[in-house]
């Protein structure tokens, strides 16, 4: 038994050694190249800047000058000098400036090997070693500029920006400070952090996004996790997401198989939810209206004690409905073949708020005072 173990360990050690030797040899033969290019352009309030990149980062900084500076660094690594020369011929930056439009685009001429390059770059980014291609942009712009950014297999870093912003990012990280203008943000297989937003349209898939304050968000998402501190108006179209919202004034939209958690709700909601769950930890007194249509969606509402509410709850015969044990007046009646309807008031005094729930299928509904 001991001899067998000894042989097994020797064999394993030999296999590891044989695996490491070619890697070491390959690394020692790597050939590298670095090229840098810069361009400078005048800018006005009507100017739009567009950057399209692959395999690297885009960093946008603001300055006080009425001009745009674009600095691009290209890092290349190959296993032989001839392959490196081929790679140098294949990759360059294309600059275009026409009137009020400025564009810098990463060009990769050898499209025949495009898929293999992208797959290899994904592996390189994940391991952090042996990167074949890395193209990084550092851009300096006036804060009022409109900016369009597209990046694949890389990151985007944003300073404060007051102009319109359009971001399309896949397989990377977005880190932005204050985005004050209208914006459109598409994230796919990405992570993002935004300190504050004005009005934005978001398309988020297979991503994690954390946001601070926002004025108005129109969000289409799937298989993502969204954290948001505060928003005035939020519209969602959600599939298989997890939402964590700290403070929401107006909440509208649709969801399927999503979990929605709101800590502080202020004013109005209109939601249509299939499967999943909705929890509102604190519904402020004096809210205007809450409407939720639930199709196999569990609901938990926790009310501030000063709330005065008219309620109308349609619930399936297999649904479980729990209403407050105090400050409640309710009547229940049969509504159709499979449903009951509970109507009445919650709280003390003349109602000023409206709560309506249509629970079409089996679910759990819990409403209580805090």
Predicted regions and their residues:
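Intrinsically disordered, low-complexity terminal regions
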Residues: 2-370
